[in-house]
């Protein structure tokens, strides 16, 4: 190696270590607040007894595990989770899965339930949730505050977004993705200039603005924000004092910030510049699709990336078991995810996600379905295009997903024909609490 080549390599190493050190300092100065109090009503029966971020996903995880794993893998170790709606299972999961951080060196996942800290009202919106916890934010004294939703599926290095925020001198940075124009109606939509400064922002517009030169795409907010702390405090106080505000980031805080502050967009892309994987699983159809995508030979969302593990609570189950090898009675799974503790006793599973501790009896066939934990499926069942909720018992000979009219009489059928089955729909009351008729 020549002297000039050696100097270039040394310069690259110096630049890498310098940038890494700066990024580490920035992440240490950042407080992450995860909004996890949403009801998730579009998920119907899946959120009857649990908050949306606590809904199981991908065979063994909860939805919130993806945002929290991104934090840990990005070097962010000061995290608050704001809870409200039916939060018991979520809080229990956080206590079991996320108690491994070291409080003595300033690492934590702190649960921040709605407590009426500033009056008689619960969290009235996403912005109000932060406003009611401003004293806690003050105590941690961060330079930057990152706000995340706890209900999306993706893997992302947040430190890169933080560094863009710091280097640009922005007051506010918003993570964004490109989405088809028709789908953009469900998101906050923004316009940017050539320097990625946001010039317009509209929450859930009827007529979404498109990307210049790309009339079929819009630039949509991911619900990920980085704030310089002093700006955030000012914005939250002003919003709390506004009697006409709905106290929501997308409807109130962000549109006002565009006109009064330096707000920039951070495009979430892969290393090659293509659109990175990000899924809003807020409907049963989108939830089912995101799970089905994991069954591909090489899915976009790589759960097997050792450099970016998805952390969760590891329940103690034996390995999955496949038994019987007779014609018509063979325990097998094809293009599927099957978790620990499952027994496929002469049953056939194809293109499905089977969560832990599920048992499927002989001569049954499961296709294109999501089977949540601790489900028992009897003999001679045929199930396709379905989501079966946790703890459901499916009797021998049950057929689901073949007759839309019959399914609609017994269960919930989505616009795209996915059948949701819960224990309550089958008269199996798993909870002592009942709602008076």
Regions found by a protein language model. Name each.
Residues 2-31, 230, 234, 238-437:
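Left-handed beta-helix
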Residues 2-35, 42-51, 56-164, 192, ...:
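Conserved N-terminal catalytic core of the sugar/cofactor nucleotidyltransferase
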Residues 81-83, 176, 387:
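Short internal beta-strands
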Residues 86, 116, 179-181, 205, ...:
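Glycine-rich beta-alpha junction loops
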Residues 98-106, 194-200, 262, 298-303:
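Proline-centered turn/helix-capping motifs that create local helix->coil transitions or kinks
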Residues 112-114, 175, 266-268:
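Conserved beta-strand termini and adjacent loop/short-helix elements that scaffold enzyme active sites
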Residues 156-230, 237:
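Conserved core of the sugar-phosphate nucleotidyltransferase
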């Amino acid at each position: 190696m020549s002297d000039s080549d050696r100097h270039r390599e040394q310069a690259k190493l110096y630049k890498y270590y310098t940038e890494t050190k700066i990024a580490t300092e920035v992440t240490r100065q950042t407080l992450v607040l995860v909004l996890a109090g949403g009801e998730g009503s579009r998920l119907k029966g899946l959120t009857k007894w649990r908050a949306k971020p606590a809904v199981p996903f991908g065979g063994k995880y909860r939805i919130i595990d993806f945002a929290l794993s991104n934090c840990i893998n990005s070097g962010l170790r000061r995290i608050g989770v704001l809870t409200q709606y039916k939060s018991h299972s979520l809080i229990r999961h956080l206590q079991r899965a996320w108690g491994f951080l070291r409080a003595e060196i300033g690492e934590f996942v702190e649960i921040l339930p709605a407590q009426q800290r500033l009056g008689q009202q619960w969290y009235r919106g996403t912005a109000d949730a932060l406003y009611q916890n401003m004293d806690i934010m003050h105590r941690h004294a961060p330079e930057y505050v990152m706000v995340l939703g706890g209900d999306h599926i993706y893997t992302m290095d947040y430190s890169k977004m933080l560094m863009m925020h710091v280097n640009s001198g922005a007051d506010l940075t918003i993570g964004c993705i490109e989405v088809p124009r028709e789908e953009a109606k469900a998101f906050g939509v923004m316009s940017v200039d050539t320097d990625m400064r946001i010039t317009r922002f509209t929450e859930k517009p009827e007529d979404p603005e498109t990307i210049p030169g790309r009339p079929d795409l819009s630039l949509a907010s991911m619900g990920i924000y980085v704030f310089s702390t002093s700006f955030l405090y000012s914005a939250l106080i002003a919003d709390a004092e506004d009697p006409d505000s709905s106290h929501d980031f997308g409807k109130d805080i962000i549109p006002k910030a565009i006109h009064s502050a330096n707000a920039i967009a951070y495009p979430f892309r892969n290393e090659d510049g293509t659109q990175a994987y990000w899924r809003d699983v807020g409907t049963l159809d989108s939830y089912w699709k995101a799970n089905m995508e994991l069954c591909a030979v090489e899915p976009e969302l790589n759960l097997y990336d050792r450099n970016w593990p998805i952390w969760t609570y590891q329940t103690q189950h034996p390995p999955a078991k496949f038994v019987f090898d007779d014609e018509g009675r063979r325990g097998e799974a094809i293009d599927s995810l099957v978790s620990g503790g499952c027994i496929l006793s002469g049953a056939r599973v194809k293109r499905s996600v089977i969560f832990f501790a599920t048992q499927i009896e002989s001569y049954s066939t499961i296709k294109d379905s999501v089977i949540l934990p601790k489900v028992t499926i009897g003999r001679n069942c045929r199930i396709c295009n379905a989501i079966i909720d946790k703890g459901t018992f499916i009797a021998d000979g049950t057929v689901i997903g073949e007759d839309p009219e019959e399914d609609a009489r017994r269960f919930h059928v989505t616009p795209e024909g996915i059948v949701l089955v819960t224990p309550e729909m089958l008269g199996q009351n798993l909870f002592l609490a009942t709602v008076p008729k």
